[in-house]
């Protein structure tokens, strides 16, 4: 037993010595050895200690992103926005062969039949059909709202969780899909109001709000209150206002928040009033109606919030 232990310790010492020698330059005995791409090089004298002759890159060359996409022979990465995560193939709808020539009538009919069967076998059961329809709805609404790809991914993940937890039972697929998209916008900090989401949805606002609260509670989603300042860049861009107005609007919101005026107020309405007040203070005047149309709030809301903000800034009414 003791002999085996001594032999093991001896092997460990020899291995450690070998590693130290591998990390040391044989030319100048420097330990300043780095790995640069496929080579181990001494930084002091420049000696190449070890190199890898295998090129792990592609055999083709590309000089811009379009050429790289055209020559690449791998598929797109997996995505949660498709019910099969993008792993299945699809038959093209262009009815052309590999050389770009149009197919004859017999071949076109054959390809149409193959497409139909392929669509049928892609969804094996009711759960997959449910998921396919819901994710297509999320993609449609996300495109209409102009939100980034990350929001679609998050919304798809939330819907998959809701489906797994059987939260869809007794509720419409459109309602849960819309609620998941709204929750994803909130989580990712992409300012979209419930009214804006309702405009692109196929259900009413009351059902969206009710389903959103249910899904958020059942899945324990961590969603922070919307910051009115998140709306400012979009409102200012639509109204063609300068960065000075945005900065002033941020100052107005911060001052109002310090005095507790944000509690119970609509974030979009508060942001719209701040933009209106800032445009007046910076001599880039916009009417209440123009701001209300962009922010999708009423002029009464802007007037009420504007009065509160001006008093908070100490300018009087």
From Swiss-Prot:
Keywords: Metal-binding, Plasmid, Repeat, Transcription, Transcription regulation, Zinc, Zinc-finger. Pfam families: TFIIB (PF00382), Zn_Ribbon_TF (PF08271). One of its GO terms (cellular component) is transcription preinitiation complex. Stabilizes TBP binding to an archaeal box-A promoter. Also responsible for recruiting RNA polymerase II to the pre-initiation complex (DNA-TBP-TFIIB). A zinc finger (TFIIB-type) spans 21-50. Belongs to the TFIIB family. Zn(2+) binds at residues 25, 28, 42, 45. InterPro entries: Cyclin-like_dom, Cyclin-like_sf, TFIIB, TFIIB_arc, TFIIB_CS, TFIIB_cyclin, Znf_TFIIB. Sequence repeats lie at residues 136-219, 230-311. The gene is tfbC. This is Transcription initiation factor IIB 3. GO terms for biological process: DNA-templated transcription initiation; transcription preinitiation complex assembly. GO terms for molecular function: DNA-binding transcription factor activity; TBP-class protein binding; zinc ion binding. Residues 1-25, 62-83 are annotated as: Disordered.
């Amino acid at each position: 037993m003791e002999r085996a232990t001594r032999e093991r310790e001896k092997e460990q010492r020899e291995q450690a010595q070998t590693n130290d020698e591998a990390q040391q330059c044989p030319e100048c005995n420097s330990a300043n050895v780095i790995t640069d791409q496929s080579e181990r090089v001494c930084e002091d004298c420049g000696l190449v200690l070890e190199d890898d002759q295998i090129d792990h890159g592609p055999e083709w060359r590309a000089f811009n992103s379009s050429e790289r996409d055209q020559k690449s022979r791998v598929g797109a990465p997996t995505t949660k926005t498709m019910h099969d995560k993008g792993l299945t193939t699809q038959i093209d709808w262009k009815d052309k062969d590999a050389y770009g020539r149009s197919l004859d009538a017999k071949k076109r009919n054959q390809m149409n039949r193959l497409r139909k069967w392929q669509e049928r076998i892609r969804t094996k059961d009711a759960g997959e059909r449910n998921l396919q329809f819901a994710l297509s709805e999320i993609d449609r609404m996300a495109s209409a709202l102009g939100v980034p790809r990350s929001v679609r991914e998050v919304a798809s993940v939330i819907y998959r969780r809701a489906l797994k937890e059987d939260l869809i039972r007794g509720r419409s697929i459109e309602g849960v899909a819309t609620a998941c998209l709204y929750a994803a916008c909130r989580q990712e900090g992409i300012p979209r109001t419930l009214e804006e989401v309702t405009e692109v949805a196929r259900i009413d606002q009351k059902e969206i709000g009710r389903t959103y609260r249910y899904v958020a509670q059942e899945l324990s989603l961590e969603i922070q209150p919307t910051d009115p300042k998140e709306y400012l860049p979009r409102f200012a861009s639509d109204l063609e206002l300068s960065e000075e107005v945005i900065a002033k609007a941020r100052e107005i919101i911060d001052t109002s928040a310090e005095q507790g005026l944000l509690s119970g107020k609509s974030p979009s309405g508060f942001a719209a009033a701040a933009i209106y007040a800032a445009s007046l203070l910076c001599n880039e005047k916009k009417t209440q109606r123009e701001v209300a149309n962009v922010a999708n709030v009423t002029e009464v809301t802007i007037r009420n919030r504007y009065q509160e903000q001006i008093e908070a800034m100490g300018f009087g009414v």
